Amino acid sequence: MEEENVTSSPSTPVHRLRHRRRSNEVVTDGDKVNASPLLVNDRNKYKSFMVRTYSTLWMIGGFVLVVYMGHLYITAMVVVIQIFMAKELFNLLRKAPEDKCLPYIKQLNWHFFFTAMLFVYGRILSQRLANTMTADQFFYRLVSGLIKYHMAICYLLYIIGFMWFILTLKKKMYKYQFGQYAWTHMILIVVFTQSSFTVANIFEGIFWFLLPASLIIINDIFAYIFGFFFGRTPLIKLSPKKTWEGFIGASVTTIISAFVLANILGRFPWLTCPRQDLSTGWLQCDADPLFKPEPFALPAWIPEWFPWKEMTILPVQWHALCLGLFASIIAPFGGFFASGFKRAFKIKDFGDSIPGHGGITDRMDCQMVMAVFAYIYLQSFIVSQSVSVDKILDQILTNLTFEEQQALFVKLGQMLKDKLS
């Protein structure tokens, strides 16, 4: 009986000895795998890695195909992405019981969405639409009239939506309805701010859309690869899966890729020429000085055994380094912001439309930040802000009627004649 009491007592030396023995047992291989901090040693994570890889390859293939088709098709792709993003974000705060009592709330959201789309794209593409229609006098006058009253039409559509919202207010539902109204407008600001800059970059030359977008894709892929195989040190609490190894490895890869990729893409006129209309034909133009090769002498600290003392580069490659730095260091904070947002709403992903990636919005968080920076950098440091013949002609074609253009032509001809006489 004494032995039984000793054995059953948790405070006896025998029990403590047995406890220590259990803690010193040999760990099985399976336990070692699960205890490893590297994601590559986790079977579930490895399966997720393969699914994510297949999805990424399909997305890259589709992206390359659309880029090959040209400016107008890339813009159409941006519009489709916007619609999917808006759908995911609209659904985020919807509640089924309340929506059943408000049958028109979804239609109202989409009314505001398409009104905002008409306003944004009308302002961006109006001049190019007018340039496309100059050959047909009837369509040119029709388009000119629509452009002239574009803002009034958009405002009228918005007021219709505003009145529609007021008329659908229901007792005991006010807070939910006004919350949806505010949420809808926030979505429109986020989605269309990014897209307006993206489309503007596309028509300045596909290069200015393709390079920034590709750098974000490269950074995202290599952050995942370096983190998957080497990641041990957590980077930020908002995203526990992000590691310093992934962040640093992706940053170095992205900056190098920016310099190399700019040299490759900058040699194709089809990618570098700006598009002034909405046609789909191939482009040819005189190369901008940014895309003309120049000799570059390598620094003196390069070892003597290195075979090249001079190399040919494009001036745009130096600008590409700035884009690469931003894509690798600043743009990921768009992803961190999205992670914090998802934690606030206690969701894993914005959607499930892309296997292994989540929703469309999950892929666009860093792209939104990058598109805005690329546009601001392009307009501030690269594109000339001086008045040009093309810009004046665009203003004339957009803002003057056919009769006013004829009058301007006569007056301009008379002025030139007087100067020459």
Curated annotation (Swiss-Prot):
The protein, known as: Phosphatidate cytidylyltransferase 1
* PTM-bearing positions, type N-acetylmethionine: M1
Organism of derivation = Arabidopsis thaliana (Mouse-ear cress)
Required cofactor names: Mg(2+)
Instruction: Report the SS bond pairs.
Output: none
Its topology with respect to the membrane?
Multi-pass membrane protein
GO-annotated cellular components: endoplasmic reticulum; membrane; nucleus
Cofactor detail note: Requires a divalent cation for activity.
Q: Where is this region: Disordered?
A: 1-26
Its taxonomic placement starts with: Eukaryota, Viridiplantae, Streptophyta, Embryophyta, Tracheophyta
Please, one GO biological process term? developmental vegetative growth
Q: Where is the composition biased (Polar residues)?
A: 1-12
UniProt KW Transferase keyword: yes
Q: Which reaction does it catalyse?
A: a 1,2-diacyl-sn-glycero-3-phosphate + CTP + H(+) = a CDP-1,2-diacyl-sn-glycerol + diphosphate
Summary of the function given for this chain in its UniProt record: May be involved in the synthesis of minor phospholipids and in modulation of IP3-mediated signal transduction.
